[in-house]
Amino acid sequence: MIPAHQRKNPPEESVQIVNRDNLVVGAVPRSRMRREALIHRASYILVFNTRDELFLQKRTATKDIYPGYWDVAAGGVVLAGESYEDSAGRELTEELGVTASLVHLFDHFYEDSANRVWGRIFRCTHDGPFTLQAEEVASGRFITVAAALALSRTEPFTPDGVEILRRIQEGG
């Protein structure tokens, strides 16, 4: 039998669906969550170096939401039966090849026409190197939070990420 990660069409992920109070109400395939803009959970991991610069990532053009945008965090949807913490550790390892201690900063609700998400925001420290996941991350670089916010006025950034950065800059 061929392992799932080696098949051409692996089974679709099942993601946790929550209500506006962030209580789990079920699980659905990722495509349905996106199609119906269902409220879901996601982990966000802000990676800072020892100079307190943020690792900014360029999303690949194949991402299902905000393709080609700059993103301030590693992370992704919380899978059915998974905790925020487990999701954060998994996503950090998958996307950047990093294992690091995570510090929970805050929880954050974000909503726009394409996305409704309860996010748990974590922070970690890592100077590199990184092993970028080719399917998700096109490139990355360290930048100050102030410079990232300035860049977000002229370059496409994930809107939830910009809100998180503003909250970080205001002191959480």
Residue ranges and their predicted role:
Residues 9, 71-73, 132-136:
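Short glycine-enriched loop/turn motifs at secondary-structure junctions
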Residues 20, 59, 145:
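Residues immediately flanking
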Residues 42-74:
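A glycine-rich, hydrophobic loop/mini-helix early in the fold
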Residues 24, 29-31, 80, 106-109, ...:
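Nudix hydrolase/Nudix homology domain
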Residues 36-38, 65-69, 143-144:
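A short, polar/proline- and glycine-enriched secondary-structure boundary/capping micro-motif
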Residues 2-44, 50:
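Acidic, metal-coordinating catalytic segment for phosphate/diphosphate chemistry
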